[in-house]
């Protein structure tokens, strides 16, 4: 998506800008699952992106970055004054250790701005190669997969030669601040948006157990988000195992859960959960008859579907703490997701640095994206139900729906590459680096000028009336009943 305004070019030139002397502007780091998504991230305000080879970057599927795309990405990033980090955070078995150096050597020669790594053995191998002069001296960033949760671990990795630590998602704001105080000269990176894994920073075995697809090899099947039925159980007096019991037809599980939560809240959340000693059996929809014992205590349920992380309201605090980079998860997400999250977090960072109050409309903009419900995760300590989505394992559509890309505009008519259906009378939103604009769609034409009542979806191309200044924008349909300003 090309940048057409002097405003965005001006801000691009001011790297590490800071209008408030007390706050340094943190880097905004976006995911790139393809070159188009990388370009959109930069256009909408990202300072850097991360991407990696499918074999080594925990994204074996839906990942377009082969060696040729990585080379193009690094070159384009540097031409724009941006950064490109190569994700190489696999926890490899022996067969991949043998091939790793062979495959990473040409990537290092391209001089990315950093290698995101998790495995100590691979880090040692790369550092030894750099120390011997075999490779260019590329900074190493420690992946969130390494589960760094305290300042002594940060100091250890600093001695090893790591330049940046991507802190574990399980840390609170106060814990992050303590690490910054104890490690003032180490770069710190924090996730602020995206999917949350129910395991400790992604170290999960559910997918491997159910499907023999190892999440730590980049093939997670998201078993935590499947549909599970709950059945009461009793203890077998002979074996001690949990066995299913006939559920009372008058038993209301939702009511029992609500009563348990009320009881827990009444004791201040510090006592033992009333349901802690009860064992239930879970039955996954695709595995009838395979019953798994499950317990819930004050920390939650250990097979569950987490809400998505959204920490845009904490950007100012993170900037004041001195976090160097704010990171968005989502290499498999859409170009629309990349553009909207980059735009929202860019505004939040710029407002914080300029001393402006947080704009709550940014939360509304992010709620327009498909999501599983939002939580601030462990940044703030909240009851367990605030972290979890008990009702559905898929993302809800949000209040705006990505429907197309503006390819060109001529004589007041925009050519749209249609992605999803929209029709005359819909409220539309144009998403552009210079600002967004809402309007009611009055006409749709074919490329030949024939009138249409709707654009059926991909792979259609249609024309709609639109101002010239929105060339290269994205187009969304605003769902009924959603308000908001016409421009932002």
Model-inferred region functions:
Residues 2-8:
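Extreme N-terminal basic, low-complexity initiation segments
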